[in-house]
Amino acid sequence: MDKIKKEIEDLRSKINYHNNLYYNLDNAEISDAEYDGLYARLKFLEAMNPDYADAASPTQKIGGAASRVFTSVTHASQMMSLDNTYSSEEVLRWHERCVKSLGHGNFEMVAEAKIDGVSCSLTYEGGVLTVAATRGDGKTGEDVTANIKTIKTIPHNISFKNKIEIRGEIYIEKADLKRLNEIQENEGENIFANTRNAAAGSIRQKNAEISASRPLKFFAHSFGYGDVDVKGFAEFMDLCKSWGFSVTPNRIRTADINEITSFYKRFEELRAGLPYDVDGIVVKINSFAEQKILGVTAKSPRWAIAFKYKPPQGKTVVNKIIFSVGRTGIITPVAELEPVAVAGVIISNATLHNFDEIKRLGVKEGDTVIVERAGEVIPKILNVVKDGGGNEVKAPKNCPSCGSKVYRYEDEVAIRCINPACPAQIKGHLLHFVSRAAMDIDGFGEAVVEQVVEKKYVKDFADIYNLKAEQLLTLDLFKDKKVNNLLLAVEASKKRSLSRVLYAFGIRHVGQKTGEILANHFEDIENMLAASLEDFQKINEIGPVVGQSVYDFMQSAKGKEEIARLKTAGVNFTQPKVQLAGNELLGKTLVFTGELNMPRTQAEALAKAHGGKVSGSVSSKTSYVVAGADAGSKLTKAQSLGVSVISEEEFLNLIK
């Protein structure tokens, strides 16, 4: 088994084991520092090897906890991340962009402390706190209402009676962390590595009484939506304060960008003396009207920027430089380091990106280097401080996985293996194909992919659908029940929508959203096979580059063969049509709760295909709550709000 893949698999297994102990059984075996080291290592390896990504990885679950502990909440307004920088020059460039977009430079800005905590949204209806949710992926978070209500600095009732969502940061003060860790030690429990980890672990406890025992606090810093009669951010913060929320006192309001950079420098000296951890400042355009003019990108608002302090660094030795082969054939160098603690996390690997970067750094095995956690997440080598006398690292002439000659295209810095039969690439493609966001074949993880490729049972996507029980019985730890479950999962995946199949193919530039756009436009794979290059390129949001990539795949012998073989195997290649009229779900909002006979994803897809909208939380605007067995708080809330509650059978009758 490939060394990196095996390490990733082992790390995921260990982290899932410790997550279950910590979050579900409240019985951790390792310290938070040790856990953070495992988690940071896994996240780094996944970032360096995106082809090994798996939606089921613990790095894809907020705070590391198993997502089944909490129900999901769909944010009415996306909780976006902020663009961030460590450079005053970049802040000045941000200001210049705002000046250009607004047409003047006399707008006010607000700069305030960036608390190092956990983002949370609070929804109030009729002045009552109804839902508290984690940020999650920005679109969907987790319902942590019961735990959040134990935080004394969060009011359960406010005087504002219209519906409003207030956002802020949950944190633990430094002194409180010290006391909490003393209690943990006295009780024989593991201590927390830092305030942020303590806050994250505390709000995501299955037992709300544990959350109540933790010294959590909350600073309000923005709002998601709500009809408030204020013109700008500073006024809104004053309003929040009048409602009983705590807001950061470390704030300035000015129209002078130089005052912002001066505040940043002054505050860096002061932050060590603050009772809470701060990792930078946030700068926002004050006026809501001007914020609206500036707008947002897909991930962040243009009217705000996080001006962060430089990440922590450490000194260590490069033990070895290895080469990793990704799904697309790109060969990436990775430095294996003598483990070093940086900001409470053990770092034992660092990205070298590409061979030009190795040359720029002049790094060799045995060198002493400065490593930093860029963005406090992904470790990288900053520079060499002592020559270890090792040999110069040269780019491989042959693929470390298959031995084929490697190539470097003129317009790329990356070195690639272009052998389609390369085991590393085949495994990477298969892992992507079976992943949850693609064909979602439950149980077809890395260990299975590794073995079916090594045993030559599977060499392409279609081979997955030709696997036999007797073949699977030869795999490690596979007995009759496990074989049957995997074969059922493979069979179920044949019904996935065209959009998911397109994403599963791994066509360059085709992500989940692009797959949906293409599938909704063409509706059937035959239409795509018959389409011209112009047909692809003229689609809104596709454009020439993506259009060319998709067209090339559809016209390639390999693409046509793969599609034909998958069709023969019974894989669906059509996109469900949205019913525009003549049914009960058109324009209605549905919430699914409890255990259904069909997979939740299938039920949600059916609702969307018939014109419905799916939400993760219940409100007065919910049309139907579809309740299965063991329905919990969503059912209770629906009943209290008078929302129509229907069974799975009644739901299916609505879409007949």
UniProtKB/Swiss-Prot annotation:
Family to which the UniProt record says this protein belongs: Belongs to the NAD-dependent DNA ligase family. LigA subfamily.
Highest taxon, organism lineage: Bacteria
PANTHER family listed in its UniProt record: CHROMOSOME TRANSMISSION FIDELITY FACTOR 18, DNA LIGASE
Residues noted as binding NAD(+) in the record, renumbered to the chain: 32-36, 81-82, 112, 135, 169, 284, 308
Enzymatic reactions: NAD(+) + (deoxyribonucleotide)n-3'-hydroxyl + 5'-phospho-(deoxyribonucleotide)m = (deoxyribonucleotide)n+m + AMP + beta-nicotinamide D-nucleotide
An example Gene Ontology CC term for this record: cytosol
MF-aspect GO terms: DNA ligase (NAD+) activity; metal ion binding
Residue ranges of the TM segments: none
E.C. number: 6.5.1.2
InterPro entries: BRCT_dom, BRCT_dom_sf, DisA/LigA_HHH, DNA_ligase, DNA_ligase_AS, DNA_ligase_CS, DNAligase_adenylation, DNAligase_N
UniProt keyword annotation of Nucleotide-binding present: no
Keyword Manganese annotated: yes
Active-site residue numbers: 114
Segments forming domain BRCT: 580-656
Enzyme class: ligase
Name used for this protein in its record: DNA ligase
Gene name tied to this protein: ligA
Species this chain originates from: Elusimicrobium minutum (strain Pei191)
Keyword terms: DNA damage, DNA repair, DNA replication, Ligase, Magnesium, Manganese, Metal-binding, NAD, Zinc
Primary role: DNA ligase that catalyzes the formation of phosphodiester linkages between 5'-phosphoryl and 3'-hydroxyl groups in double-stranded DNA using NAD as a coenzyme and as the energy source for the reaction. It is essential for DNA replication and repair of damaged DNA.
SUPFAM superfamilies: BRCT domain, DNA ligase/mRNA capping enzyme, catalytic domain, Nucleic acid-binding proteins, RuvA domain 2-like
Names of required cofactors: Mg(2+); Mn(2+)
